[in-house]
Amino acid sequence: MPRSTRRMLLILALLAVALPAGAWSHKEHIQLTRLAAGRLMADPNTPADMKAWLKSVSPQVLTMDEERQYLMSARVGPFPRGVEGLPYWAVVPDLVAMTDGPGDSGRKIQPFDVPERMLHFVDCEYFNKDIERRRYRHDLSNKPKLYAFPTGLNDPHPDDKNYKPWAKAGMLPFRVEQCYAQLVENLRKKRLTDKPGQFPRDEHAARWAGYLAHYVQDNCQPHHSTEDYKSRAYFAEKRTAPNVHWDMEGRLVDDDNNDYPELRSEFWTVFAKALDEVKDPIDTIDLRTATVEVALVSYDALPTIGLAAMKAYEQGGTPDKPEGGVKGFDAGKFFHAKGKYLGRERTVLEIKAHQMAWSVKRVEKLWLRAWEEAKAPVVEP
């Protein structure tokens, strides 16, 4: 077998293993990023020069009717098809993570010195001082307080000077901060997009805006805030438990078959409404702290998602003591299950729509903030 063929088979095998453990699917990252760009271009308050830049780096903006059709029928798959500009850069972090391989074998991203996959989440339970509390519980009793998250990457836990939690917990807050800073720097240097004669070719604002969109969107996926990122706690057989992470995101919208058309249509209606109604409640300027705050809010959706998964797979027992085997996934039971989140009862479908709409609003906010910061005079310390 030729070496190139063996290499491609290896990559495909790694993708098959890694894809279900990702964040929002490629299709969702593409759509959320494109929506953020389109909404800013349509907003009369967006600076004209920013609109011109967005148009040049996101040329595939669609109408809402076209976006609905995209959600209903577009097939993207593990290798994104027909995508360019900001939406393309918004899926690159997942492509890097998937081709890195398992564990710590991937190329280390600096200055974090960890593989790409460690930059997509922050497992909140690791910020508990007591080791026995560093796991997810249905009653949210192991959800830490904001003060427990150290400021610096190598800073110890405020209540245990011998414990540095970031090394295990994931470094999403620091990656968001880094991408934002790189976006501002490239905007200031007028490195707006890839062009001949500009080197390095892939060092430009469009790349970092796409990366920033990706990580901000990941931040709004509840499973990216917990060590139990597949909701295995809700199943008796932990090792073979269903991947609820994937059920929550890509399963509904991007597959080889025309699955769940009624649910997709219902979701789009709820999501389109959420885009008009959802407000970003996070006003914190410091991006690391703001990212942690988003994770802590999203964390509260996990019990509803876990209980919905038990219903969808007919898992017996209780959340604290699941019993017996499971059956096939029932998407209707899963997405229509209800629980309390953000002060009112919501279905899982509504939670998914809310989180995705929230991510669009946060991407818009940070892109606009970066543009305005890049235009402002640099103040010397």
What are these model-predicted stretches?
Residues M1-L9:
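Bacterial N-terminal signal peptides that target proteins for export
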Residues L14-L15, A37:
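Short, linear, compositionally biased motifs with a strong N-terminal bias
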Residues G22-R207, P222-P381:
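N-terminal, motif-rich segments that launch catalysis or mediate targeting to/interaction with membranes
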Residues A205-N219:
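Short alpha-helix carrying the canonical HExxH Zn2+-binding catalytic motif
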Residues L12-L14, P78-F79:
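Alpha-helical interaction segments
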Residues A18-P20:
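N-terminal signal peptide c-region/cleavage motif recognized by signal peptidases
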